[in-house]
């Protein structure tokens, strides 16, 4: 059904939970393809023992390069990007398949809904593998009441492999990965994709970016004036991620229909001017490279 690509960086115990949840809670059979960054924690031996195909770099290639390498091994028609600290709840794949069948073409970007202590819907079933309460999650996830939402940019996301290849996958200049999701959305927008939909009943529990928290002071992720990925996006596209999500993707409001071009009202024009001022500052005064 889907090729599930999972970049992982020395995070074996969480990866085991992620893969286990896919095997346990999926209605359909899926292809699982992790990309191992470094793999000094025994990840490669584990995947070999489970007969799971993978790609590997002996360095931390980040999310983008890892995704692109692993996606080349995909043999299904659909690429699904997942974090290694996800737990996939029952029914996740049936919801995606129903939506794909309903759309009837390949020009879409679909995502699930992350739940947890920091997700869109909160359900405290633990913050790490040591206090994870799987039973509580399985007993309560169906009680959550959320809506299908507009303008998703988050994992787990699903796109057709032809569309993935059309835009070249993730842009590797966003190493180690921050900002690469909205950049992918922008590339899809430029190729006339207008369905960006988050599905309320496609649920994954997220432990909360375990690896990012472990490395959140890395200069490759942050600069002294904020997030590096935001600056790369601004210099590449001439607008901020916040502007793109607000006026183009109209993120997080209830989903109604596929998107149209943004209305260029006063609020749009004023915000666009601020983007251009920010662009000039970052490029010529801050001299970000």
Residue ranges and their predicted role:
Residues 21, 28, 36-45:
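A conserved acidic beta->alpha catalytic loop
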Residues 57-74:
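Glycine-rich, basic loop-to-helix element that forms the pyrophosphate-binding segment
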Residues 2-14, 18, 25-26, 35:
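A conserved hydrophobic helix/loop-capping motif in glycosyltransferases and polysaccharide synthases
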Residues 150-168, 173-203:
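A short, conserved alpha-helix in the catalytic core of glycosyltransferases
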Residues 79:
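Short aromatic/hydrophobic "clamp" motif used to bind/position activated sugar donors
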Residues 90-128:
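Conserved donor NDP-sugar-binding/catalytic core segment of glycosyltransferases
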Residues 127-150, 154:
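Short, flexible, basic/aromatic active-site loop/helix in glycosyltransferases
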Residues 115, 175, 197-220, 232:
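Active-site donor/metal-binding and catalytic loop motifs
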């Amino acid at each position: 059904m889907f090729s599930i690509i999972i970049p992982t960086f020395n995070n074996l115990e969480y990866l085991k939970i992620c893969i286990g949840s896919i095997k346990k809670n999926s209605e359909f059979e899926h292809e699982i393809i992790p990309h191992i960054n470094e793999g000094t924690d025994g990840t490669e031996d584990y995947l070999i023992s489970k007969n799971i195909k993978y790609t590997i770099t002996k360095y931390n290639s980040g999310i983008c390069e890892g995704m692109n390498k692993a996606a080349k091994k995909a043999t299904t028609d659909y690429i699904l990007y997942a974090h290694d600290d996800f737990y996939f709840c029952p029914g996740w794949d049936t919801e995606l398949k129903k939506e794909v069948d309903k759309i009837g073409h390949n020009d879409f970007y679909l995502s699930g809904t992350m739940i947890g202590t920091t997700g869109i819907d909160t359900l405290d079933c633990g913050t790490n593998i040591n206090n994870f309460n799987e039973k509580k999650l399985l007993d309560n996830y169906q009680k959550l009441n959320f809506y299908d939402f507009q303008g998703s940019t988050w994992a787990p996301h699903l796109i057709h492999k032809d569309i993935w290849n059309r835009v070249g996958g993730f842009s590797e200049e966003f190493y180690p990965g921050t900002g690469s999701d909205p950049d992918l959305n922008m590339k899809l927008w430029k190729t006339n994709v207008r369905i960006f939909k988050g599905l309320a009943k496609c649920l994954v529990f997220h432990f909360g970016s375990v690896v990012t928290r472990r490395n959140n002071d890395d200069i490759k992720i942050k600069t002294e004036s904020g997030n590096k990925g935001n600056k790369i996006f601004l210099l590449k596209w001439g607008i901020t991620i916040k502007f793109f999500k607000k006026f183009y993707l109209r993120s997080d409001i209830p989903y109604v229909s596929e998107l149209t071009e943004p209305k260029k009202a006063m609020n749009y024009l004023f915000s666009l001017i601020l983007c251009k001022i920010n662009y000039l500052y970052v490029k010529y005064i801050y001299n970000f490279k």
